[in-house]
């Protein structure tokens, strides 16, 4: 037991951008209570269409803004006494029965980006402002691309463990039934926040013969945000975009989006979505029952995993192994 407790180091939450909702889920004037990063939060869309995220509890008497709160212009109104809080700054903008607003009347307002079909929040353990950005995916909503298919799942895992899978080609043989370990290479971008994995496409599905010379290109930004594209399919393409968000240290909410060029979506789209959901279900028992080895015993074939561990350290405010 002592060894297990020592090795099962509790990883803190990494800093970065994480999805807190699908864009399509939040209409104008909607107010939704959400729980991420170990925090009670409130997500709402202002009358001008901006998605906002603030801490949940009113500084007045502690009412939860997400249960009965209403959008008033660019603010969210507390259901208890009607105090209104600006979604961008968090400052109290109005008290209906008092002209003077106390200086401490504010809630924390989180930095939010809305792109690629999702609403993202910036998390930082020290509440520092965003330190890096991530790109728009032109495929999502593109004229030649299909309406995205989506899938999501809440899992008992740490976000780093789920992301580490991308750097573990060997597990595809033993967990997913691949006949071989796909050859792959990793390129780390010079800014340090992004890396790319290029691997041969190994498939046993009915469309394997069409993809035998193609490659999978995985781009990642921070811990938990990934875009997987196909390369080498003449005149066609696929994109799988995903964000895995910490709910607590050992509980995550993963969202996946799949889109394909319209000329192949009927042939490939449904099969890829089935493959995605099947793959996650195969990984789930491992993630559910594994511990985090802070100092794993690597063999010489674990080069990608060792490189990933070193790269991932930069996203934590406190030292991690």
Name every feature range the model reports, one short phrase each.
Residues 50, 127-321:
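C-terminal catalytic domain of Rieske-type non-heme iron oxygenases
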Residues 12, 31, 46, 67-69, ...:
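Aromatic-enriched hydrophobic runs in primary sequence
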Residues 12-13, 36, 105, 114, ...:
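A generic structural signal for short, non-catalytic loop/turn and secondary-structure boundary residues
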Residues 7, 13-14, 175-177:
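Non-catalytic accessory segments flanking enzyme active sites
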Residues 1-11, 321:
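Basic/polar N-terminal segments that are highly enriched at the extreme N-terminus
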Residues 9-10, 33, 111-113, 244-245, ...:
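A general structural signal for short secondary-structure junctions and capping/turn motifs
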Residues 2-6, 19-140, 239:
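Rieske [2Fe-2S] iron-sulfur-binding domain
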């Amino acid at each position: 037991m002592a060894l297990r407790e020592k090795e099962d180091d509790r990883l803190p939450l990494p800093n970065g951008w994480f999805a807190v909702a699908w864009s399509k889920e939040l209409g104008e004037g909607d107010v939704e209570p959400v729980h991420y990063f170990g925090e009670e939060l409130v997500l709402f869309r202002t009358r001008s269409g901006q998605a906002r995220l603030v801490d949940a509890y009113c500084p007045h008497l502690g009412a939860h803004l997400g249960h009965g709160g209403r959008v008033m212009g660019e603010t969210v109104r507390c259901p208890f006494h009607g105090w209104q809080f600006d979604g961008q700054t968090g400052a109290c903008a109005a008290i209906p029965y008092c002209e003077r607003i106390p200086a401490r009347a504010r809630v924390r307002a989180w930095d939010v980006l809305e792109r690629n079909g999702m609403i993202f929040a910036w998390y930082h353990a020290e509440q520092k402002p965003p330190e890096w950005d991530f790109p728009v995916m032109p495929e999502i909503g593109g004229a030649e691309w299909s309406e995205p298919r989506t899938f999501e799942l809440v899992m008992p895992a740490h976000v780093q463990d789920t992301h580490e899978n991308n750097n573990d080609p060997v597990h595809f043989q033993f967990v997913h039934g691949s006949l071989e370990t796909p050859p792959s290479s990793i390129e780390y971008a010079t800014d340090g926040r992004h890396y790319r994995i290029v691997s041969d496409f190994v498939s046993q599905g009915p469309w394997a013969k069409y993809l035998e010379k193609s490659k999978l290109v995985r781009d990642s930004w921070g811990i938990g945000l990934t875009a997987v594209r196909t390369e080498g399919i003449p005149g066609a393409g696929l994109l799988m975009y995903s964000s895995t968000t910490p709910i607590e240290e050992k509980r995550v909410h993963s969202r996946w989006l799949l889109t394909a060029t319209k000329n192949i979506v009927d042939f490939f789209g449904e099969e890829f979505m089935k493959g995605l959901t099947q793959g996650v279900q195969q990984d789930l028992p491992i993630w559910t029952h594994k511990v985090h080895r802070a100092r794993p015993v690597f063999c010489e074939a674990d080069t990608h995993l060792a490189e990933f561990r070193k790269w991932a350290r930069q996203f934590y405010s406190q030292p991690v192994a």
